[in-house]
Regions:
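Membrane-interface helix-loop junction between the first two transmembrane segments
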Residues: 4-7, 130-132
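Short acidic/glycine- and proline-prone juxtamembrane loop motifs at membrane-interface regions
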Residues: 1-5, 49-50
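Alpha-helical transmembrane segments of multi-pass membrane proteins
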Residues: 5-16, 34-37, 54-58, 83, ...
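Transmembrane-embedded, aromatic-rich helix segments that form part
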Residues: 51-64, 108-114
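Membrane-interface transmembrane helices that cradle and orient dolichyl/undecaprenyl
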Residues: 14-32, 41, 60-74
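Transmembrane helical bundles and short interhelical boundary loops of multi-pass, membrane-embedded
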Residues: 66, 72-173
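Small-residue packing motifs within transmembrane alpha-helices
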Residues: 30-38, 53, 82, 109, ...
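Membrane-interface alpha helices of multi-pass inner-membrane proteins
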Residues: 33-49, 87-96
Length: 173
């Protein structure tokens, strides 16, 4: 049977719902649309293996939006609801994938890394750490670049600790 046609429906639905959520001015519709985008992502994952393109197609533009200063609390909540909804449905409801398979997927782990960067930015620049980062030579580096550098270092260390020394090299090759 033609599964690609159904999968494309869910892929474009996920993209459209995510964008509608990202651009929504009101909280409840934003959360609902992000939730539905997560369900659409999970539906495609259950139909066709090309679901990873949804994760990549949302993670990369979201990271670019972050770097140009278009991501705040609203966008972070949208992104996290979409990501967690899709994970919960894929792992716990459909049982098609395990948590280990999700974490070891380069495409999906890149979506997790983008969320980590968003959260790290909030932690670094909305707490007392901000005062330290704005002193001395740190003050010359843009906030988002500082967040990106610190986040990538932390993610590299965490992947080294939890997955071993060859994880990053194997994923990049």
């Amino acid at each position: 049977p033609e599964k690609e046609s159904a999968a494309f429906f869910f892929m474009f639905l996920a993209f459209n719902l995510f964008l509608a959520s990202w651009n929504s001015k009101k909280e409840i519709p934003r959360y609902l649309l992000a939730f539905l985008a997560g369900l659409s992502t999970a539906a495609m994952a259950n139909i066709w293996g090309a679901y990873v393109y949804i994760y990549l197609g949302i993670a990369v533009p979201s990271l670019i939006a972050f770097l140009i200063g278009k991501v705040g609390k609203k966008e972070t909540s949208t992104y996290s609801i979409w990501l967690f909804t899709s994970f919960i449905v894929i792992v716990f409801i459909s049982k098609k994938f395990t948590i280990n398979e999700i974490i070891h997927s380069t495409y999906i782990s890149s979506s997790i890394a983008v969320l980590f960067i968003f959260i790290m930015h909030f932690i670094l620049f909305n707490t007392k750490i901000k005062a330290y980062l704005e002193k001395g030579y740190h003050s010359k580096i843009p906030n988002r670049a500082t967040t990106l550098i610190i986040s990538l270092i932390i993610l590299f260390i965490l992947s080294f600790v939890f997955f071993g020394q060859n994880f990053v090299a194997n994923e990049l090759s």
